[in-house]
Amino acid sequence: MSEMTPREIVSELDSYIIGQHSAKRAVAIALRNRWRRMQLGEALRHEVTPKNILMIGPTGVGKTEIARRLAKLANAPFIKVEATKFTEVGYVGKEVDSIIRDLTDSAMKMIRAQSIEKNRYRAEEMAEERILDALIPPAKNNWGQTEQTNESSPARQTFRKKLREGELDDKEIEIELAASPMGVEIMAPPGMEEMTSQLQSMFQNLGGQKTKPRKVKIKDAFKQLIEEEAAKLVNPEELKQQAIDAVEQNGIVFIDEIDKICKRGESSGPDVSREGVQRDLLPLIEGCTVNTKHGMVKTDHILFIASGAFQVSSPADLIPELQGRLPIRVELQALTTEDFERILTEPSASLTEQYQALMATEGVNISFSADGIRRIAEAAWQVNESAENIGARRLHTVMERLMEEISFDASEMHGTAIAIDADYVRNHLDELVADEDLSRFIL
């Protein structure tokens, strides 16, 4: 679980997302409150529930990007889902309970990786011994029984030294490695994924853990043996309990496109993929118990962050009960020309930096002048205003169009330096930007 302060979280998000300070502050406070809650006594901790967040803003302003970056910062079970993929219980499609099942699977993977890393040193020692046994097989007595290995024998120590120095990495040995589990592919109808995964687990466990001799390079065998030995040191039941605890205490669910499940106008008949989904989400967000293959999971303290553009609907179109369960509202602002300029240069691995690195692989040196970047930002903003406003995603389209000629000819331009200034941008983009019909379809 992350112990970063809200200021540190916002600073980290600033490295990737331009503007949207109020949204960054809201998620930073929510993330820090997870840590604060865990410092409380057990009785009070149980009473403190997370304040769920609703992020409102046009497409392409950073809602999903905030979720992606938050997942890396949280160091807690995290899952991002699209609200449009679910239908009401009893109809064909995914049920909302699968969100918690997927979150628990994600936690299992995270906790298993942490446990393996914790036991890595011991696993490496055991893997090393198995490779040395394959290189210097233990002697057998007159009755054909394997004698105890002499750990300090000169030959074994010599091979150990060579192994650690990497001299034997490319040498092939025959060694007993775990056989791949029986692969059974089952095509599941929508909504039956849980049953399918249980059937697959059952088939995989039928044969037990078998090994078979394989001839492999030592460096490849070493990696696999470390995984095998580390897995032996991990208690599966303990892992399950730790994963369930992590989900219940620190789990975060990000629900994207929640505006797409708002009811639109008066309609007769059941609305199974809109209002029905909202009603199914209510108990999940309020707190209920979900049955997963790893055990029962309580959702009382899972943090839910929902986001939507709300261009053809408003948050008031959500059912009142759901609105009440998303008490913190954050509005993200549409991007300006200045924001586009900053997006092109400031974030880590910005778009301009990416294109420079890609062209450098062909020996072409690309440089962007300040007036060139300003003109690219103006072109993107102009097209957003005249056509559909898709936010920062428009920059990808504009940049790809601008760089198309260079990208095509780069392999024949080794050693060339190209400066992209305002004149270069005007020559390549102005005609398209000025013609609304062309920009609508090409940009």
From Swiss-Prot:
Keywords: ATP-binding, Chaperone, Cytoplasm, Nucleotide-binding
Amino-acid positions noted as binding ATP in the UniProt annotation, renumbered to this chain: 18, 60-65, 256, 321, 393
Principal location class: cytoplasm
Record keyword Glycosyltransferase present: no
Source organism superkingdom: Bacteria
Protein name: ATP-dependent protease ATPase subunit HslU
Subunit structure: A double ring-shaped homohexamer of HslV is capped on each side by a ring-shaped HslU homohexamer. The assembly of the HslU/HslV complex is dependent on binding of ATP.
Its biological purpose: ATPase subunit of a proteasome-like degradation complex; this subunit has chaperone activity. The binding of ATP and its subsequent hydrolysis by HslU are essential for unfolding of protein substrates subsequently hydrolyzed by HslV. HslU recognizes the N-terminal part of its protein substrates and unfolds these before they are guided to HslV for hydrolysis.
Keyword ATP-binding among record annotations: yes
GO cellular component: HslUV protease complex
SMART domains on file: AAA, ClpB_D2-small
Family: Belongs to the ClpX chaperone family. HslU subfamily.
Pfam families (alphabetical): AAA, AAA_2
Molecular function terms from GO: ATP binding; ATP hydrolysis activity; peptidase activity; proteasome-activating activity
Intracellular or extracellular location(s): Cytoplasm
Gene Ontology BP term (one): protein unfolding
Species per Swiss-Prot/TrEMBL record: Edwardsiella ictaluri (strain 93-146)
